[in-house]
Amino acid sequence: VDYAYHALALDEHRKDFAPAVWTVRKPENVEVEQRWFVGAHSNVGGGYRDDPLPNLALAWLQQKARAAGLGFKADVVVNDQAPLANINDSYSEFMSGLYKRFKGDKRYYRVFGRGVNETVDDSVWKRWQARPDYRPPTLSGVASLRR
């Protein structure tokens, strides 16, 4: 493996969907990046109809794949307003709300910085700047570095 890229959902709060962040040190000459994106699991990976959020991660992965020599018939189109799109509350919606009823309101917040080469996508900071109500606890330790 010469390249390894991992898109992570910053706003997924189901502990059962905790990301498998890569923590093993990378070998020499292997490019690794794990990037956090706005949204819950299916917002980042795709799964909701008419949702612009998955295109953020897909465009990033396409860019990385193209840089590694892969070709594409078309580029992913990312709307400038995509980072401000609705984030689905997968915690409350999952299993028609049964998940939240069973687990209670014990939302899980991801931990940033324990993995190999973790980065935060610019779309997260765009949303942070535009939406004063968007302050993921996961980023509390790194947000001051970004401003």
What does each model-identified segment do?
Residues 1-147:
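Active-site- or binding-pocket-proximal scaffold segments within functional domains
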